[in-house]
């Protein structure tokens, strides 16, 4: 089924050969989500029900039902696919195992295959500072080095004039690119200094040069410290803005940003 022509097909499949799909299409137009509206998000969408499955069932029998934007060529293999997916999951038997399981859910893949970290469910997307602060914990400490590399490589590819873009840019968060160095220091324990320099040496030099050159309201002064100031943006972690004005103005040499700068250059 497909809601609209520009939407992907949605495949509803089961491993039960005797299952019969009963069409019973119906629309729910302009379904409203009050909380989304309260938070300033788009709060209406159309919902479609296409029908239901009827199948013979008996006690002790298992039936696997799949909902996906990708068609399963042989639905009879769904039982095996489900068992394999279940076996690959981490067991949730205590607080630590639940924490590890949850950590995996924050690294997601875009349609183009690139990886990113969601800042939180259900409201947030990718945020530069949160991504880099969290990455060692949700990836490296879980033994998921490839996830860490994939996220970093996504950030690195999307830089311009030596600086990261979007919420990873110093023009949006004065400290965000500096957390990149902090992540690399932890990644070095796994890959080694030579490999880190080979993969990211040019990027590190470009970032430091961009700070010295100045990006937005952020620049290194003659005294060697990072100055951050913008009339309409909160450039530190205290980033609340009301009516276009930062709630807490921290213009100057923020201590935590300069600590990260010192860490990056030394």
Question: Which residues are covered by each model-predicted region?
Answer:
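Acidic, mature catalytic/reactive cores of soluble proteins
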Residues: 1-266
